Amino acid sequence: PGGQIVTGPEGAGLTKEEGFVAGKPWIWVHDVLKPTMTVYPPKVKNTGAAVVVFPGGGYQVLAMDLEGTEVCDWLTSIGITCVLLKYRVPNGPKYRSGPYGTRSPAALQDAQRTLGLLRRHSAKWKIDSKKIGVIGFSAGGHLVAAISTNFKKRIYKAVDDADKESCRPDFAIPIYPGHMAKDYKIELGLNPF
């Protein structure tokens, strides 16, 4: 939803050695123009709960394994359906600044749409529509805050009946959210209070 975006083709890569985390490279995608959601069913007894995972990457790339599939592996191992959202991170500053408290209005549109789709098709995926939450890391944590405070009205034109469903998360877990402060002139080591 939300109009046509024209930028370069989607790409993927591995981090260079200096960008390793815990001694390992991480897989990232960039220039994402078409959002996708991948549903991972629980590996053990289904609790009915579902969690949408928003990987981080500064609204420029998405850390698909470190802050995505690895999280889904854990969630599904404890009976939770995991939905990995590959939200739009198109190349260009126009898409990394905008209203609605997010650096990327396209990402918020994708988050709103995903929650509506999950509620609309909850029976198909064996999800309790009142137990759908979100978790995100860094920019994804920022997206958690954005969807948690921008759920009353869609920021795109309705596509189908899924957009009549609530896009309000039942619980939200922002992990080291980025982009939360408007004024970066304050040094992080100082306590402003």
What residue spans do the PLM features occupy?
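Short amphipathic alpha-helix adjacent to the substrate-entry channel of hydrolases
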Residues: D65-L84
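Short beta-strand element of the alpha/beta-hydrolase
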Residues: T47-G56
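Serine-hydrolase catalytic-loop signature spanning alpha/beta hydrolases and amidase-signature enzymes
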Residues: G58-V61, C82
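Primarily recognizes the serine-hydrolase "nucleophile elbow" in alpha/beta-hydrolase
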Residues: A106-P192
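Active-site loop/turn elements of alpha/beta-hydrolase fold enzymes
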Residues: I80, Y87-V89, P177
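Catalytic nucleophile-loop/oxyanion-hole region of alpha/beta-hydrolase
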Residues: A63-M64, E70, Y87-D128
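Short beta-strand-to-loop junctions in surface cap/lid or active-site-entrance loops
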Residues: P1-G2, I27-H30, M37-T47, A123-W125
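N-terminal targeting or regulatory segments adjacent to alpha/beta-hydrolase or S9 domains
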Residues: P1-H30
